Every structure is written in C-alpha cells, then in structure tokens.
Amino acid sequence: TIERLLRHWADSTQRGQPDDEALHMARFSLHAMATGGIYDQLGGGFCRYSVDDQWMIPHFEKMLYDNGQLLALYADAAFATGDGVFRRIAIETAEWAMRDMQSPAGGYYSALDADSEGEEGKFYVWTPDAVRAILTADEYNMFAPVYGLDRPPNFETASGPSLARGPRTRV
C-alpha cells in the first residue's frame, strides 16, 4: 500500500497534479514504522510485526524477505522525497542484513527467531540497571527519556527498542 501511494504520488506529480495527500500518507506511515517498536533502533532491521495497537512492542522475529521489501521501500522513499530519515533507515537495514543475516559461506539466513535461549526478545530488551552498567551517568540521563527507561517497562519486565513519545495518532 505504501509503495502504491508513492508510485501514485510520483505519477500524479509527472502529470502536473501532485497528490499531496498520498505523499503525506506514505511519509506518515514510513516515519511511524521507523520510530515505532518494529524497527530495531540499535541494530537496524525490522521485526515482523507489532503485538500492541500502539506499535511499541514488536514480535521480535526478523524475516529477511520483510526487510528486503522494506529496504527497497525506504530507499525509493528517500530518493523520491529527499527525506534523510528514510535514507538512514534504508542504510541501517542493509547494514543489518549484511552483518547479521549473511552466513560465512556467503548465503543469507532467512530469519532470526523471536526467542533466544528460550526467552522471547532476550537480546532486544533492557533494564535500566543493564543500561546504567554500560553508560556514564550523563549518557544514561540523555538515553533514558529517549528510549523510555524513565517510565515503567513496555515489555514484561524490561523495555524494548522503540523511541519514547507521547500519545500517537493511530497508523
């Protein structure tokens, strides 16, 4: 749908009657996905879907084919709009795929399971104490409000990889 919105906007622009509403819907959706819980803010790449209606908690599985399609979509959106956020997301998604999904033999793995060592999202969530252990006090004070560590956890007993923000408009 987002790809179709971008193509429609590009076609309408070439005809001299740009459909700005189509562009707005595409940009809004892409930004919401990039700042919500399905995008891995630290490692890059997208989780398969969200398990809550605010798009803050991902199902921690990452599929190569989903990320390939999203990489192409964000690259196209960056090219069409000049939006630096879309460019960054495309680059980070490509870097994630090459770093984490490529096998030593040169092929690619199809997915990363949501469960690690018998625990869902084990390597995608953190506690304030775990973050304090690796950051200085000043770094933690900047990091915590951005990633929601100054509030109750958003996933079981820890917090997941979404940018913190106030109430959202539904996507």
Stretches found by the model and what they are:
Residues T1-V171:
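Glycan-recognition and catalytic cores of secretory/periplasmic carbohydrate-active enzymes
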